UniProtKB/Swiss-Prot annotation:
The keyword Electron transport applies. InterPro entries: NADH_Ub_cplx-1_asu_su-1. Disulfide bonds: none annotated. Keywords: Electron transport, Membrane, Mitochondrion, Mitochondrion inner membrane, Respiratory chain, Transmembrane, Transmembrane helix, Transport. It is a single-pass membrane protein. It comes from Pan paniscus (Pygmy chimpanzee). This is NADH dehydrogenase [ubiquinone] 1 alpha subcomplex subunit 1. It is found in: Mitochondrion inner membrane. Belongs to the complex I NDUFA1 subunit family. It holds the Pfam family MWFE. Its main location: mitochondrion.
Length: 70
């Protein structure tokens, strides 16, 4: 019957899900607890560069709040 495919389908789904989740957790672990930022457009790249300059430590993910900007 049709339900005989469910175990195989669930195993395949889990196998496809694991790399995506692992990548997200690895990026979060290596970037100080924040998600990895991706710059698809030039404007987003400029924002990341601005955040890197403002933080003062050459890391875009160590950002300061607006109250700490001179």
């Amino acid at each position: 019957m049709w339900f005989e495919i469910l175990p195989g389908l669930s195993v395949m789904g889990v196998c496809l899900l694991i790399p995506g989740l692992a990548t997200a957790y690895i990026h979060r672990f290596t970037n100080g607890g924040k998600e990895k930022r991706v710059a698809h457009f030039g404007y987003h790249w400029n924002l990341m560069e601005r955040d890197r300059r403002i933080s003062g430590v050459d890391r875009y993910y160590v950002s300061k709040g607006l109250e700490n900007i001179d």
